């Protein structure tokens, strides 16, 4: 859980900005977006497989293009 204490002499706007930065660093917003809709285990498996294929394809392209 992200928490920010307002420092002495700090405005609320500055504290909110610090809070937003901390949320970004900790991946809170990404987690919220990821959990916004339920995904069945089969869909998660397909997405993971597709991501793995993309990574392999990128690596092969990079290796073949730059190895010459």
Swiss-Prot record:
<dbReference type="InterPro" id="IPR038380">
    <property type="entry name" value="Ribosomal_bS21_sf"/>
</dbReference>
<dbReference type="GO" id="GO:0005840">
    <property type="term" value="C:ribosome"/>
</dbReference>
<dbReference type="GO" id="GO:1990904">
    <property type="term" value="C:ribonucleoprotein complex"/>
</dbReference>
<dbReference type="InterPro" id="IPR001911">
    <property type="entry name" value="Ribosomal_bS21"/>
</dbReference>
<protein>
    <recommendedName>
        <fullName>Small ribosomal subunit protein bS21</fullName>
    </recommendedName>
</protein>
<comment type="similarity">
    <text>Belongs to the bacterial ribosomal protein bS21 family.</text>
</comment>
<keyword id="KW-0687">Ribonucleoprotein</keyword>
<keyword id="KW-0689">Ribosomal protein</keyword>
<dbReference type="InterPro" id="IPR018278">
    <property type="entry name" value="Ribosomal_bS21_CS"/>
</dbReference>
<dbReference type="Pfam" id="PF01165">
    <property type="entry name" value="Ribosomal_S21"/>
</dbReference>
<dbReference type="GO" id="GO:0003735">
    <property type="term" value="F:structural constituent of ribosome"/>
</dbReference>
<dbReference type="GO" id="GO:0006412">
    <property type="term" value="P:translation"/>
</dbReference>
């Amino acid at each position: 859980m992200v928490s920010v204490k307002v420092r002495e002499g700090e405005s609320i706007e500055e504290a909110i900005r610090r809070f937003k930065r901390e949320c970004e660093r900790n991946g809170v917003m990404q987690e919220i977006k990821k959990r916004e809709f339920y995904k069945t285990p089969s869909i998660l498996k397909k997405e993971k497989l597709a991501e793995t294929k993309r990574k392999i394809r990128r690596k092969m392209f990079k290796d073949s293009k730059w190895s010459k």
